[in-house]
Amino acid sequence: MPTGENASEHIGKKREICKVLPIVSPSVVTKQLAFNRVGDKRKVRVSSNFLDVMGFKPGMGIAVEPGEGMGGFSVIPATDELQTHQVYQRRYQPKSRSNNPLETVIEFSGQGLIDKCFPRYTERFHVEMRKGRVVFTPVANRAFAIADRFRKTSPFRAFVALTGGVDIHVMEALGWKAEIVLEHRPVEARDRASGRNLSEVHTLNTLVNSSPRILLNEDIHHLELDRLGALLAECPPIGLAHYSLGCDDHSNAKSPRDKERSLEDLSTMLDMVYPALKQIEVVNPAVVLVENVPNFKASGAGAMMGTTLRRMGYFLTEMVLNGLDFGAYQGRERYYMVASVFPGFVPPKPEQRAGGRLWPVIEKHLGDCADVTALKSIQARESTSRRMPAFLTRESTSCPTILKSQDRGVKDAVYIQDGGRIYKPSVDLVQELMSIPDSFDVSW
């Protein structure tokens, strides 16, 4: 590393080299920078090689042209009579910046000018360099802009995606309004094999049990953002974006082989976070709620979701909650990500578990539960190497997690064992075991 006189010689040679390098001068160069802050005071500073490239040489006089309102300002070359500032050059110690010891700088520290041209909540500014003009404009503070929209309107409006209708039904009972609902049941392999199209089933379930104003029966991967933006323009601001992203490919219930196969045929749900994040950028909700299985938290998809939301300005809270700690019958753990423009979200505190036996709930439905003792799937439970859910018995104090395959009578479904017989829980019993309100209609 050159020092002393050698350092000066090194810098001099570097400047000579820069003079003869065939640098192409573009029409426009842009940057996005943060204000330099000293206490409560802000400085607008651009330290860049591109200033020189675009014609703003060290020693040049410049003048400021304020924009309209708080729209920033422009900088143009100026003569001695009109100049208010000057372009200068910063020299770095060769030890720390030997590859680039010189850099051209424009700086503005007058608080009157800055406060007149940039809102107080602005944290960053955009720089557009052209030949003979540099334009500084404020970059909107996303979190502030979102929060500001709810000063004169209710925040209890939601964009709800992929819930099957249950979450919306409960939300409406709590005073929320589902302005826009995105609901579409993906076509599964068993649907294709049987020639069925059930893409509207969850959507119809939503309409039976809730009152969305706008219903989008579209695949989350193919929803056009321009159309979504146009629909949002017809709505009041959205306070909550609620996503129950597909959990199959994060769940231990799906085999590694099936997960690989779903990647090949594009039925995987791992990448649902990508369209969800793009939609959140358009919806601009004050709060985002993502619900999934616990494995989602440690997955690449979960990391991408959380990191991107933090970059957007949201404060992140993650938690894994067990239904038994909140009055449910199922020992079902779910992961929740709450991303809010308001800091300080406090997760709900677990309640004391009831601890009583579950049989009174089961017994009143037992007459409607089918006897499936002789089914092959029941016999297969004894020979499989996989861990099967425990039978519901007179001694049970909780219910294992009920999967979406429950109704198909698979071997790892939840069953009742009593008096030497095996029973398949009825629809009404499953609804009660899953703590789905009686008011939720599944009879249609």
Predicted regions and their residues:
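Beta-strand-rich non-transmembrane domains
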Residues: Q32, N36-D40
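Class I S-adenosyl-L-methionine
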Residues: A230-C235, H250-R408, Q417, R421-Y423
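Short polybasic/polar patches that bind polyanions
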Residues: D52, E172, R310
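Extended repeat-based interaction scaffolds and adjacent low-complexity, acidic/S/T/P-biased segments
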Residues: P2-A7
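C-terminal target-recognition/interaction regions appended to catalytic cores
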Residues: E9-S27, D40-R42, F50, G59-R149, ...
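Core alpha/beta nucleotide-donor-binding catalytic domains of modification enzymes
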Residues: A147-N284, P294-A298
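Eukaryotic intrinsically disordered and solvent-exposed regulatory patches
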Residues: S47-L51, D167, G323-L324
